[in-house]
């Protein structure tokens, strides 16, 4: 009788354990956060990770090797004094600074990349826009939108937006060039942050993307 009880106890235990293992795991962002919402053109957009544990990327971000140049590995700090952040810091920025209109998320890639999909809530300002080589026309139009005020021939950045800038990933130089160009224009380094992981790391972690409407 005693052996029968022990057998039944173990049977029930392993049945329970098997049922727990068969339950589809929940894939959160961190231990507490499952998802969050950003505003895109006045409409809410839910940001979350792919809930399929077997999910694999099928796009170009699965590639490990690209010709260098131009696709060379970028330094952790593109410009001295610029802070580099990871995904959780980016998400905090999206939840707090972006939602309160204190900051903007900038996709520094060329439009053809941006149109394929971007991090939800990002706006596209190609790195070349900030280059003085392209003349002052673009700069004079873009910087005021970022909160800068032109006084004579100089810019006042005291009320300029805080920015997080990204591109395709650690092998892409577009964000690095955008940051370098902004700093040359006088944009305060403390108001610029670099998300080095870019689109590749964002998608490797299973985060969904937003495809801008044509």
Please place each PLM-identified region on the residue numbering.
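Positively charged, proline/Ser/Thr-rich regional signature most characteristic
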Residues: 71-162, 212
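Flexible, polar/low-complexity N-terminal or interdomain linker segments that lie immediately upstream
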Residues: 19-116
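Bacterial N-terminal signal peptides
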Residues: 7-15
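Short, solvent-exposed loop/turn and secondary-structure capping segments
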Residues: 116-120, 137, 175-179, 205-206
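Solvent-exposed loop/turn segments at secondary-structure junctions
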Residues: 110-113, 129-132, 169-173, 198-202
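Positively charged n-region of N-terminal signal peptides that target proteins for export
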Residues: 1-6
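Catalytic cysteine-centered active loop of the rhodanese-like fold, especially the PTP/DSP P-loop
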Residues: 143-200
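Active-site neighborhoods of enzymes that stabilize oxyanions during catalysis
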Residues: 205-214
């Amino acid at each position: 009788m005693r052996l029968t009880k022990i057998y039944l106890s173990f049977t029930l235990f392993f049945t329970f354990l098997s049922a727990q293992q068969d339950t589809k795991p929940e894939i959160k962002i961190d231990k507490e956060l499952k998802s969050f919402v950003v505003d895109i053109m006045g409409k809410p957009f839910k940001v979350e990770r792919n809930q399929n544990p077997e999910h694999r990327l099928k796009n170009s971000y699965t590639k490990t090797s690209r010709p260098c140049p131009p696709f060379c590995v970028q330094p952790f700090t593109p410009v001295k004094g610029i802070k580099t952040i990871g995904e959780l810091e980016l998400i905090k920025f999206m939840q707090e600074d972006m939602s309160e209109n204190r900051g903007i998320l900038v996709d520094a890639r060329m439009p053809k990349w941006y149109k394929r999909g971007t991090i939800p809530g990002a706006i596209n300002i190609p790195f070349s826009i900030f280059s003085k080589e392209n003349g002052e026309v673009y700069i004079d139009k873009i910087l005021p939108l970022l909160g800068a005020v032109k006084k004579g021939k100089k810019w006042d950045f005291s009320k300029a937006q805080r920015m997080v800038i990204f591109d395709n990933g650690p092998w892409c130089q577009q964000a690095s060039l955008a940051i370098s160009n902004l700093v040359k224009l006088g944009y305060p380094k403390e108001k610029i942050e670099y998300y080095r992981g870019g689109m590749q790391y964002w998608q490797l972690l299973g985060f969904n993307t937003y495809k801008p409407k044509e």
